[in-house]
């Protein structure tokens, strides 16, 4: 049996459960439970994705969330020397996220959810502050929006049509 290149890449992805919620509906025979899960997938080298899923069983919700996360992978190419190239402030619904580059040896200074996202993205040195909403989904969306808005020095020079020696 041979593995394709695509499935080999999929095997390198690590999956983490960010949030699990249990909802209950009261029916004639008692309570009926359903679950939702927010799942994060990454390889620590710039590939990252998140997925949200609902199901009647917890394991099904986690499995479906992982599948959704693998379908929505993004690639962050502007990670220079383990940090981000510039500061970024992002608004997503009610959540605000501030990411600042840090010197080598600083580590990841951030809240637990944002720290997990940045670790799985492969960022080594960064300072992050989450402002506003504490809703996990909004914080995850804000983090992804911030990471996608990063541009390297080379990209900025190309946009400005400036040559650099």
Curated annotation (Swiss-Prot):
GO MF term list: rRNA binding; structural constituent of ribosome
SUPFAM superfamilies assigned to the protein according to its UniProt record, in alphabetical order: dsRNA-binding domain-like, Ribosomal protein S5 domain 2-like
Residues covered by the S5 DRBM domain: 13-76
GO CC, alphabetical: small ribosomal subunit
The keyword RNA-binding appears for this protein: yes
Gene Ontology process terms (BP): translation
Keywords for the protein's UniProt record, in alphabetical order: Ribonucleoprotein, Ribosomal protein, RNA-binding, rRNA-binding
Source organism, top-level taxon: Bacteria
Record PROSITE patterns: RIBOSOMAL_S5 (PS00585), S5_DSRBD (PS50881)
Database matches in Pfam families: Ribosomal_S5, Ribosomal_S5_C
TM regions (residue ranges): none
NCBIfam families: rpsE_bact (TIGR01021)
Family: Belongs to the universal ribosomal protein uS5 family.
Subunit comment: Part of the 30S ribosomal subunit. Contacts proteins S4 and S8.
Function: With S4 and S12 plays an important role in translational accuracy.
Domain notes: The N-terminal domain interacts with the head of the 30S subunit; the C-terminal domain interacts with the body and contacts protein S4. The interaction surface between S4 and S5 is involved in control of translational fidelity.
Entry protein name: Small ribosomal subunit protein uS5
Taxonomic lineage from the root: Bacteria, Pseudomonadati, Chlamydiota, Chlamydiia, Chlamydiales
Gene from which this protein is expressed: rpsE
């Amino acid at each position: 049996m041979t593995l394709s290149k695509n499935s080999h890449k999929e095997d390198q992805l690590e999956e983490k459960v960010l949030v699990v919620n249990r909802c209950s509906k009261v029916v004639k025979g008692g309570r009926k439970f359903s679950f939702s899960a927010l799942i994060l997938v990454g390889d620590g080298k710039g590939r990252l994705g998140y997925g949200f899923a609902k199901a009647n069983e917890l394991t099904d919700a986690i499995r479906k969330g992982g599948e959704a996360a693998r379908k929505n992978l993004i690639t962050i190419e502007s990670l220079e020397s383990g940090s981000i190239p510039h500061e970024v402030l992002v608004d997503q619904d009610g959540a605000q996220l501030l990411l600042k580059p840090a010197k080598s040896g600083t580590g990841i200074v951030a809240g637990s959810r944002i720290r997990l996202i940045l670790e799985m993205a492969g960022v080594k040195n960064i300072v992050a502050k989450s402002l506003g909403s504490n809703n996990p989904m909004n914080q995850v969306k804000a983090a992804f929006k911030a990471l996608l808005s990063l541009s390297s020095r080379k990209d900025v020079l190309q946009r400005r049509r400036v040559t650099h020696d």
